[in-house]
From Swiss-Prot:
<comment type="subunit">
    <text>The complex is composed of two ATP-binding proteins (ModC), two transmembrane proteins (ModB) and a solute-binding protein (ModA).</text>
</comment>
<keyword id="KW-0997">Cell inner membrane</keyword>
<dbReference type="InterPro" id="IPR008995">
    <property type="entry name" value="Mo/tungstate-bd_C_term_dom"/>
</dbReference>
<feature type="domain" description="ABC transporter">
    <location>
        <begin position="1"/>
        <end position="228"/>
    </location>
</feature>
<comment type="function">
    <text>Part of the ABC transporter complex ModABC involved in molybdenum import. Responsible for energy coupling to the transport system.</text>
</comment>
<dbReference type="InterPro" id="IPR004606">
    <property type="entry name" value="Mop_domain"/>
</dbReference>
<dbReference type="InterPro" id="IPR050334">
    <property type="entry name" value="Molybdenum_import_ModC"/>
</dbReference>
<keyword id="KW-0067">ATP-binding</keyword>
<dbReference type="GO" id="GO:0015412">
    <property type="term" value="F:ABC-type molybdate transporter activity"/>
</dbReference>
<dbReference type="GO" id="GO:0005886">
    <property type="term" value="C:plasma membrane"/>
</dbReference>
<keyword id="KW-0472">Membrane</keyword>
<feature type="domain" description="Mop">
    <location>
        <begin position="289"/>
        <end position="356"/>
    </location>
</feature>
<keyword id="KW-0500">Molybdenum</keyword>
<dbReference type="InterPro" id="IPR003439">
    <property type="entry name" value="ABC_transporter-like_ATP-bd"/>
</dbReference>
<keyword id="KW-0547">Nucleotide-binding</keyword>
<protein>
    <recommendedName>
        <fullName>Molybdenum import ATP-binding protein ModC</fullName>
        <ecNumber>7.3.2.5</ecNumber>
    </recommendedName>
</protein>
<dbReference type="Pfam" id="PF03459">
    <property type="entry name" value="TOBE"/>
</dbReference>
Length: 361
């Protein structure tokens, strides 16, 4: 485990985090600007020093107040910043090999292949696109043979086409490398595609931490997501494809099924499916003759009025999964919706695209 129990005064912000993170998969650190995300990873990487506390990575003690403070180069932690920070006078090959602990051709070839940078090795940073620079920066960090990788919003400085270019490489790294990654982001799109676990910071304090789906659907997460962007993550597996239409059928653990747009590639892995709360409607009886392809049976768990009183955020239990729906107070009163009541949730199949679906690692 990555054990963190630290405090740091940062101007008016006091960062205080006490938690354990798994040494496998991708842990996303999420929060608004100024929440302390970058400050936390700087403390983990040794770029800044806590005022008190302790940090350990597995059996290695990285920091203990007044007794141990390993410098960054001794922590065996790779760091990828928002900007690539490549050496302009080195070629891509020179940047990659700078700082390599062991000159092993096998590791070099594997990293270069995973990142798709074989054809860039002789070029210089000034000739690379933003996405290419970040791929080289990631490769350089990996070739130091780290025990953990810190990534501080590596897509933040890129435009949308470059983000789309780089994201598949990050997905491949997350799936192929047996290396824990702490990934800072304020983008839920990135977190959906990459993360297995999630830690939420607010004003320097941790307000939620755990498996991605659990935190994403939690009440703690709800206040930090704009009302119109509230969504749920459901777990499902591919069952089959429709023989006549470009749609794929997914099966949930509770027996409900989901039809989603597109012919998804076969996989035995569990999928994470994002559903926007504004795309969910509810009814108390099974509808007949509807164009809506998805009808999920569940029970009302909780109802939360929005701050302005214009909407109700309805949480629906679907076995172990949970689904958010935005409804009006009128609908709540007319349908007599209360906790424990059995209902049907309707979701149009066309609202879930491949950008809303990701494999669990």
């Amino acid at each position: 485990m990555l054990n963190i129990n630290i405090e740091k005064q940062l101007g008016q912000l006091q960062l205080k985090v006490n938690t354990q993170l798994p040494l496998q998969g991708v842990t996303a650190v999420f929060g608004r600007s100024g929440a302390g995300k970058t400050s936390l990873v700087n403390l983990l990487g040794g770029l800044t020093t806590p005022d008190k506390g302790e940090i350990s990575l597995g059996d290695t003690l990285l920091f203990k107040h007044k007794t141990v403070n390993l410098p960054p180069e001794k922590r065996r932690i790779g760091y990828v910043f928002q900007e690539a920070r490549l050496f302009p006078h080195y070629s891509v090959n020179g940047n990659l090999t700078y700082g390599m602990r062991h000159k092993t051709p096998e590791l070099f070839d594997k990293v270069v292949s995973l990142l798709g940078i074989e054809k860039l090795l002789s070029r210089y940073p000034s000739t690379l696109s933003g996405g290419e620079k970040q791929r080289v920066a990631i490769g350089r960090a990996l070739l130091t043979s780290p025990q953990m990788l810190l990534m501080d919003e590596p897509l933040a400085s890129l435009d949308l086409p470059r983000k789309r270019e780089l994201l598949p490489y990050l997905q491949t790294l997350a799936q192929e490398l047996k290396l824990p990654i702490v990934y800072v982001s304020h983008s839920l799109d990135e977190i959906l595609q990459l993360a297995d676990h999630m830690l939420v910071l607010h004003q320097g304090k941790m307000i939620a931490q755990g498996p991605l789906t659990q935190v994403w659907n939690s009440e703690q997460m709800r206040p930090w997501v704009p009302l119109q962007e509230l969504s749920s993550l459901l777990s499902a597996r591919i069952a089959d494809r429709h023989p006549d239409y470009p749609m794929t059928r997914l099966l949930m653990d509770d027996g409900n099924q989901l039809w989603v747009s597109g012919q998804l590639p076969p996989t035995h892995k569990q999928l994470k499916v994002r559903i926007q709360a504004n795309h969910v409607s509810v009814c108390t009886e099974e509808p007949k003759g509807s164009s809506v392809r998805n009808l999920l049976r569940g029970k009302i768990k909780e109802l939360y009025p929005s701050d302005n009183g214009e909407q109700i955020q309805l949480k629906i239990a679907l076995g172990k999964d949970e689904l958010w729906a935005n409804i009006t107070p009128w609908a709540r009163d007319e349908l007599q919706l209360i906790p424990g009541k059995a209902i049907y949730a309707q979701i149009k199949g066309v609202t879930m695209t491949q950008m809303d679906i990701a494999e669990s690692h």
